[in-house]
Amino acid sequence: MLLQIQDGTLSIGAQTVLAHFDFEIRGNEKIAIVGRNGCGKTTLLRLLAGELSLDRDDHSKAQGILTSRSLTTGLLCQQAFSDTTITVEEELLKSCPCPDKWDRERFTWEQEYDRLFTGFGFSKEEKRKRLSQFSGGEQTKIALIRLLLAHPDILLLDEPTNHLDVETTEWLEEYLRQYAGAVVMVSHDRFFLDRTADTVCEF
């Protein structure tokens, strides 16, 4: 068990969005969250990312979110970049774990960077373009690249195939199937979920 929620309830203001629910991630599961619109799927992702908290109930036996160890999570955000005047390379280098460009770890990171960048349909020359020169859909792709480069223990994806063409979607499917960590995803693309998820959780 990597993460577990037992009898959790989450409210936003006076509205209860998720009531008395259970949720669990085992190992490197690839989990599809499905359900009607407005049932709280995106809210669950925000909870797992630490942006929201479960309601406190002193009478409940539930202990909130239990984890087997300290975990890192990564959520694909809609408003991805605070400064769009810098280049793609400048933005992505912020998350590079090794500032020394001659370090072996830096070399490995840059190889992964190149693989992801071209995998999402960009040319290497576009790394030098400013973020403001890319469309909203392209910026979403770049935000996803930044997230994947961080290799979080739990990857949280909300409609990751939006703005992706068929070829790029298929590339992402293969990447996620081989991803070493857990993935929790929300998508209206059932074909994408069928090809990437090994567990379905209905809300």
In which residue ranges do the predicted regions lie?
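ABC ATP-binding cassette signature C-motif
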Residues: 1-203
